[in-house]
């Protein structure tokens, strides 16, 4: 894949420009992946493979993938590795986690992103970003909805959180949000239950 080849080439260099280009390529790849995921979810042949998944493994992979954004925006990452495991589909769960982390980075200009594991089997991702207005919160999981922040930043596709909710529904997990304008957002994925649900 050309995008992957370019990313590997750029990672061999350590400069501000290479990190910026790597970040831009990652975002292009994310948009492509969102479209493909949207199409897969609409297919009757979507397969889910449930097994014991180590959250630290998935988190580590996504943190490494997004490290260029952390570096470019000079944001702190607060995360203590955990040995927590859940029963889920690793590929689909990884997509959800990447989307949430990517959103946290996108809408946080200073401060930090904090990743923690709460009981029972709940992944919590918090940021010190611009937050979501109370009137937008009930609609952020709707397809195509970008809200005020999305319109202002012109970075939102209106698909990311919609896909996260759809995937979590299919996995039998639950996704929730708490946010305050000017203080940040906390997203939680509750994975104490799982179930392959066909639509």
Which residues does each predicted region cover?
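Conserved micro-motifs of the catalytic ATP-binding
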Residues: 43-48, 81, 85-91
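Short helix-loop "hinge" at the ATP-lid/N-box region of the Bergerat-fold HATPase_c
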Residues: 104-105
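Short conserved segment of the HATPase_c
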Residues: 132-145
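Glycine-rich ATP-lid/hinge loop adjacent to the conserved G-boxes
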Residues: 145-155
């Amino acid at each position: 894949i050309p995008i992957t080849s370019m990313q590997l080439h750029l990672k061999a260099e350590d400069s501000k420009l290479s990190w910026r280009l790597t970040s831009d390529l990652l975002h292009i790849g994310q948009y492509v992946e969102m479209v493909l995921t949207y199409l897969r979810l609409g297919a009757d042949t979507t397969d889910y493979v449930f097994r014991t998944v180590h959250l630290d493994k998935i988190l580590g992979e996504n943190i490494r993938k997004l490290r260029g954004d952390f570096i470019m925006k000079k944001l702190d990452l607060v995360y203590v590795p955990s040995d927590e495991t859940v029963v889920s589909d690793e590929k689909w769960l990884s997509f959800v986690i990447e989307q949430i982390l990517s959103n946290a980075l996108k809408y946080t200009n200073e401060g930090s992103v904090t990743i923690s594991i709460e009981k029972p089997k709940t992944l919590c991702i918090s940021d010190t970003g611009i937050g979501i207005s109370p009137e937008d919160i009930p609609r952020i999981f709707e397809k195509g909805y970008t809200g005020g922040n999305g319109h202002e930043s012109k970075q939102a596709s209106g698909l990311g959180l919609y896909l996260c909710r759809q995937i979590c529904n299919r996995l039998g997990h639950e996704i929730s949000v708490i946010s305050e304008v000017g203080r940040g957002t906390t997203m939680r994925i509750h994975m104490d239950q799982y179930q392959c649900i066909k639509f």
